[in-house]
Amino acid sequence: MTLRLHALITGAALFLLSFGGSALADGIATPWQMNFQEAASPVMERIEDFHNLLFWIITIITLFVLILLIYVIVKFNEKANPVPSKTTHNTFIEVVWTVVPIIILVVIAVPSFKLLFFQDKYENPDMTLKVVGHQWYWSYKYPDQGDFGFDSQMVQAEDLKPGQPRLLTVDNTVVLPIDTNIRVLQTADDVIHNWAMPAFGLKLDAV
């Protein structure tokens, strides 16, 4: 299958793509973690900023709806309001609940599109990494290094050493230089595979 260019990663501290060993403890999720991993790229930093913006918008909307529901339950229950209102419409309220959501969507859309366009920016690569997905392992090649390559397979649970994370430890890890722009050519040998680096805000389907 022909390799396709899926991503151009600009990394300030890209060290490895697969996890294995205690030295990687800071690069994986931790028990009861409530937030993202520490951002390792400008893209992930912007994703976090956008996530935080959405979090506060959603929180405010949720609290407003909750307060409104409580108010309606208390004020318009049968005991407090034995004679129900026969009001059919309220122009002001209808305008408000139309205009306010539009404003909220615009506030969300502007940074969202900025983030999308920012993710499409790239610089000329300093080196290339070929990634091929298989059932159930990855193959990596370094075209700039004489097409050197190897397979990277997950270490089974019974073979894990103390401190090695389950489902994240592999027998051969990918090592890349820091402060280097790296182009990733990605494809799959059989079915669709997903290749991800959460700290870099990167998640791609290998086809």
Regions from the PLM with identified roles:
Residues 62-75:
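Alpha-helical transmembrane segments
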